[in-house]
Design a protein with these regions (language model features):
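C-terminal transmembrane module of polytopic alpha-helical membrane proteins
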Residues: 187, 203-221
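Membrane-proximal soluble regions of multi-pass membrane proteins
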Residues: 1-21, 186-188, 194
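Interfacial loop-to-transmembrane junctions
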Residues: 172-204
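Functional transmembrane core segments of multi-pass inner-membrane proteins
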Residues: 46-51, 56-165, 170, 213-221
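Membrane-embedded alpha-helical segments in integral membrane proteins
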Residues: 28-44, 92-95
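Membrane-interface loop-to-helix entry segments
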Residues: 24, 78-83, 191-196
Length: 221
């Protein structure tokens, strides 16, 4: 980041102009890592050093992949399968190691374990019915990871939040295109990458446990 500004946004070798994308992504990633560290501090304070280290390893890996997918889908409108499947496996491991040994047969835990698949199926149905016009299958694969990372209750709310954010941004872009001729190509048929909205919703759900539908109250009955 420092060299980016020190060299005047130019490559040291070819002197070509560099995009603002690079320092912004690096700064955002660094801030994200600090936030993740802060969320895991209670483990460290309580003396659970091994649990802290394992959580940090898994979470930093998960969110590093999320950052890559955010930027990649934003620019290329595609989610690489290799990253999606790797993310899903790591998220599933994260979910499994946080299940109490005496709670495997409880409904909340069973829903959390099944969350990835349960979230993937509606995306797959939309993709299949629309022949890929409404939503990409890559978004469904990303839903696998979201379900296993956040669990059923928070994951479901995070997905709903992602759709709300996506709808709000879509409407805003349509209004901008209607008011400014430079953005006239932004129409109802314009393709907008959805993974960034899914990832933003996931981040909010990770930091602030969400339950839009009061499902946790049902579990308390």
């Amino acid at each position: 980041v420092i060299s980016f500004f020190a060299l005047g946004r130019r490559c040291r070798g070819c002197k070509g102009k560099l995009s603002w994308q690079y320092p912004l992504v690096e700064i955002a990633t660094a801030l994200l890592f600090v936030v993740i560290f802060y969320t895991q501090m209670p483990l460290l304070v309580s003396g659970s050093v091994s649990a802290f280290m394992l959580n940090m390893l898994l979470l930093l890996t998960i969110w590093s992949i999320f950052v890559v997918l955010f930027v990649y889908d934003l620019y290329h409108k595609i989610i690489p399968d290799g990253l999606s499947y790797s993310l899903a496996v790591i998220a599933l491991i994260y979910r499994l190691i946080h299940i109490p040994y005496d709670a495997w047969n409880t409904l909340p835990v069973l829903l959390d374990i099944s969350a990835g698949v349960l979230f993937f199926l509606p995306f797959y149905a939309l993709w299949k019915i629309s022949d890929g016009r409404w939503i990409g299958l890559g978004d469904g694969k990303l839903a696998l990871s979201i379900g296993w990372l956040l669990g059923f209750v928070t994951g479901l709310s995070a997905l709903v939040l992602a759709f709300w954010i996506g709808a709000a941004v879509g409407i805003a872009l349509l209004l901008i295109s209607a008011l400014n001729k430079r953005f006239a190509r932004l129409t109802m048929k314009a393709e907008i990458p959805f993974a960034p909205f899914l990832i933003v919703g996931t981040l909010i759900g990770f930091l602030v446990p969400l339950d839009f539908f009061g499902i946790n109250l049902f579990f308390l009955l």
